[in-house]
């Protein structure tokens, strides 16, 4: 099923001009990756709307305050360390994403190089590499390709289908979808609110 720019605007709160820039890219991705029922579409739009701040941010925001670091990564920073790292996105990424998801040590720079990008925030070397193989894109060498609307949308659809999120949408398991995307329940209230926006937009309410 295809959506209109007006439905996309109402589903994500992105504004009419932004919806016009995105609608064909998102429709193309949803068609390619079988996001093709009202509930699949609603859940997809709710999740990517949250992750991309209403389709307006395609790179992860890591500009955390000390307080934000302690709240988001309480086991990775002491209070003293949080103050030392605050408002330094590159240092933060290289620390919190080091030695996992296929990334190297903090000194490798992989954490920042493979920080979240695209509509669903693909994160980590291994996820970029998997997407690269699936989509035939040089994402390991050029991760910034996911900052382009076409690939941001395609990669989000690929991630959604490859992680079994269409099946979870069919089962109504929205919170489980959040866990698959976020590895936690960050922003659960906003995601839930966006799901209602999307359902209303698709229903024509």
List where the protein language model places each region.
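Low-complexity, Gly/Ser/Thr/Pro-rich intrinsically disordered linker/tail segments
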Residues: 180-205
């Amino acid at each position: 099923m295809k959506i209109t720019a007006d439905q996309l605007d109402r589903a994500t709160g992105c504004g009419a001009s932004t919806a016009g820039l995105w609608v064909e890219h998102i429709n193309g991705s949803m068609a390619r990756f079988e996001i093709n029922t009202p509930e699949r579409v609603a859940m997809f739009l709710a999740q990517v709307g949250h992750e991309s701040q209403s389709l307006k941010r395609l790179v992860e925001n890591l500009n955390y305050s000390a307080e934000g670091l302690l709240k988001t990564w309480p086991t990775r920073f002491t209070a003293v360390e949080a103050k030392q790292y605050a408002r330094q996105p590159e240092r933060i990424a290289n620390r919190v994403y080091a030695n996992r998801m296929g990334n190297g040590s903090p000194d490798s720079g992989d954490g920042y190089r493979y920080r979240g990008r695209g509509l669903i925030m693909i994160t980590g070397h291994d996820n970029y590499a998997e997407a690269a193989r699936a989509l035939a894109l040089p994402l390991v060498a050029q991760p910034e390709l996911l900052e382009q609307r076409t690939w941001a949308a395609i990669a989000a659809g690929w991630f959604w289908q490859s992680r079994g999120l269409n099946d979870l949408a069919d089962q109504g398991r929205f919170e489980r979808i959040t866990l698959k995307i976020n590895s936690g329940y960050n922003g659960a209230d906003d995601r839930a609110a966006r799901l209602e926006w999307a359902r209303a937009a698709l229903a024509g309410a």
